[in-house]
């Protein structure tokens, strides 16, 4: 069992009132983590520690910040086995957590490279003798709120670029992966970033609204970033706006996967299966809508054969490549969506079956607009086939969603696919590649109900720095009074 204290000012500590909560395995129900349940006073203390550490961290030479972040990346990889062991918190497969560590280490290295890429401008002034500059400076304390579904990647992403830009951070961990997020904080601290540069707060689930509001309202917190559901993201966005705190929000998705009539169907099937079912479909970029034209019958037949080879189950079983859902409630929620579609005429092509938190991958065909699965994010191992006639109809179906995070188009005619990609309402679109694709140096963000702002190295600089106008007056200046 993992014991998870808070990390405040470089020191592990219990909650001020000694309260704890438990995280249980979604597979066995056994206690996996016993976790400090932060009070409002603990939230204040974490921000105060970050604020106290800010001047020294911001004043470091960029090469020194780079060196410390690179050490953190190496240490993260060295402790990969500890992160993999923490997969028991979420029931995920070990290969998913291994991939998490690999990509998260890359994010730290990319952030390290950005410490010398924070640039300003010299701007011509209309005032004689005035030398005018636009400069970017660290903001102060940044609050990062990370989810459970890709806990290492998204926990590191919440803090890496804010740190590279010279800010200090408070990471509010997920109640469903608290040890994983606390371990990220420990790795960064052990890499020598400094006491208070990274602080980690965990809270009991029932305390989350009060703790988050307290953190956002704190005057020392200057920026907020949140990755999670659209429902909670709206609340975070409203709180941030109320307190005039700029926020980056990366929220839900219902990624469309367009298969044109000239597509390489074998390649499309492999990408669709990976995008729809990896990590049980619990990824914001997961392929949820397979939008297919004249080749639909052949594509569905090939994909059904692929899905039949995939198995969800105990992640310790080598045959269970998909792992578990986050809990049994998630399975019940998804099954309600599936049952609604089947009752309204959808066809279950292959798969299905729910046993607690284990849901077998499923493919549904003949899904139509009146079914909830047409619009609602399933966040599970369910993909639906939508049939259209021609490119314009496929594009209409792709854009007929409140979400707009990731998308994919498969076609042998790249020019044709690019013309469509430019009209898909999404922050990300991949041609002949899966919807699930992330790289540290790429701008990552959505549109519509998938949020606003972008993560990624250069894209993050604008958000996690303050743009200022500075002038130097050389020589006399005329004033009208």
Curated annotation (Swiss-Prot):
Catalytic function, reaction form: vanillin + NAD(+) + H2O = vanillate + NADH + 2 H(+)
Key words, A-Z: NAD, Oxidoreductase
One of the record's GO molecular function terms: vanillin dehydrogenase activity
Active site annotation, chain numbering: 250, 284
Highest taxon of source: Bacteria
Record InterPro entries: Ald_DH/histidinol_DH, Ald_DH_C, Ald_DH_CS_GLU, Ald_DH_N, Aldehyde_DH_dom
Keyword flag NAD: yes
Record flagged with keyword Calcium: no
Ligand binding (NAD(+)): 228-233
A Pfam family reported for this protein in Swiss-Prot or TrEMBL: Aldedh
EC number(s) stated in the UniProt entry for this protein: 1.2.1.67
PANTHER family, per the entry: BENZALDEHYDE DEHYDROGENASE YFMT (PTHR42986:SF1)
Function according to Swiss-Prot or TrEMBL: Catalyzes the NAD-dependent oxidation of vanillin to vanillic acid.
Family: Belongs to the aldehyde dehydrogenase family.
Identification of the protein by name: Vanillin dehydrogenase
Native species: Pseudomonas sp. (strain HR199 / DSM 7063)
